[in-house]
Amino acid sequence: MTTPFDPSAFLSTCSGRPGVYRMFDSEARLLYVGKAKNLKNRLASYFRKSGLAPKTAALVARIAQVETTITANETEALLLEQTLIKEWRPPYNILLRDDKSYPYVFLSDGNFPRLSIHRGAKKQKGKYFGPYPSAGAIRESLSLLQKTFFVRQCEDSFYKNRTRPCLQYQIKRCKAPCVGLVDPAEYAEDVRHSVMFLEGRSNALTDELSGAMEQAASTLDFERAAELRDQISLLRRVQDQQSMEGGTGDVDVIAAFVNPGGACVHLISVRGGRVLGSKNFFPQTGIDEEVAEVMAAFLGQYYVSSPERDLPSELIVNVVHEDFPTLIEAIHELRGRELDISHRVRGTRARWQQLAVTNAEQALGARLANRQHVAARFDALAEVLNLDEPPQRLECYDISHSSGEATVASCVVFGPEGPIKSDYRRYNIEGVTAGDDYAAMHQALTRRFSKLKDGEGKLPDILLVDGGKGQLSMARDVLNELAVPDLILLGVAKGATRKAGFETLYLNDSAHEFTLKGDSPALHLIQQIRDEAHRFAITGHRARRGKTRRTSTLEGVAGVGPTRRRDLLKHFGGLQELSRASIDEIAKAPGISKKLAELIYANLHSE
């Protein structure tokens, strides 16, 4: 029998020095990680007899063990705390869900450099601009640059193997340097202008282009003057959209907003005085957190736990926290750079701050409204199915293939708050007759529910199958074979017209058939989940089919493994170009001998 946790005995031996504490439940699962200037005083606040917030009380009720680590100072405690949170992601901590690296615009080296999106380590030679807060923001900038300055964005392998201009040249998005249709000096000038834009020097760029336009007009080069006029027009349109532009500094404007339903942190990224975009974060909040606690947790995880992330010279925030000096010191220790955190600001910076607050508030409101909308649909489904309470987990399965090729099954999961994307799964189907959807579904469900015996995964309340009586019957057979506990089975078959709103539903067995009105919230939920499963299956199938078609003809060649196959395709710019190459041309590729080139050629041209 486990000995109950004794707070008094624990506190009597607890140190009053700075450090980190870790709270565990009776099964030794980490519940919460915190830091303190005085460990004893901080931990004592959890075990007072009254005045605890409900979520804090729920945490304390689960505590079976507390461990502490004494540190030399608060800065060391903060660094250790962030390391532990990132590694263990305790359920009662505020957790930043999106930990992906941010994208940059990358300009490669060379005579005709390329603009592209880059994530991760900066290993390639060239210039990096950013970071941008989202892929959408960076694609918008690249699209503008392509329309304005025509710098190529194609892969190097594609560029090196062109024999005639591609479609981008035809629609005036590129000057075709691949086939020598642009003078190197002219291209270099376009690259220089692109760099000026990416560095935030839009005003200087516009002035330079205006001067060039006047000069072209004075020499009667009206075609060149018209081209420059169009470039200036595009740039001024962007400048009008970026009303927040000002100064030349690098600033992140961050606002946190909290209400009983959750929290949102909105970040506006300004680099070189130019707004690159913004992004919403919805941290998983643990115990009842004040807005300042959410802000401190966000800054710690965003800038301290991810030292590879770009660091501006200043943060403008809407709330202050007593840990900010410690945070600044920790960042200086990690990166050797100074950081200013500003709260009371004026003028343009105050407008930035207020805009971030407004965005955070509106984003959280929209998220909660959508959550309530989804929850209402779950309530409606429970009513339709005569359930005592709304289901908490729905799984839907679908199959996608092209005439039996590259068959993929999808599993999507929804809860009362919407899709649970971390639980989505795809299954590559093997060993079944091409086009046999029943066998494919049987394999997918067998693989999914076999894992329950090993304690993996969660049992859904409702299992949706995109199909009619046959698919539903097959799903029931799989569950019976695996002795899966009773759960609700729901088959969704398209009506005779195959239009949304005319679906036929089958509950548990094919004998229980019914339909719902087109405006039924329950039907809308079923359609939403079904369509998401369909989308997830199709994207998986297309990726698998594309990979198969690119590589299958090379997979049987001895001496051509995955790495060499990838290098070959990259060298020639694709399988089609490789198929056109002669034996001598193939032999010139890195790592390919004459004998291996003959084998590759024979394989590509066999009947």
From Swiss-Prot:
Ranges of residues in domain UVR: 203-238
BP term (GO), one: nucleotide-excision repair
Family from the record: Belongs to the UvrC family.
Protein name in the entry: UvrABC system protein C
Ribonucleoprotein among keywords: no
Top-level taxonomy: Bacteria, Pseudomonadati, Pseudomonadota, Gammaproteobacteria, Pseudomonadales
One GO term describing the cellular component: cytoplasm
Classification via CDD domains: GIY-YIG_UvrC_Cho
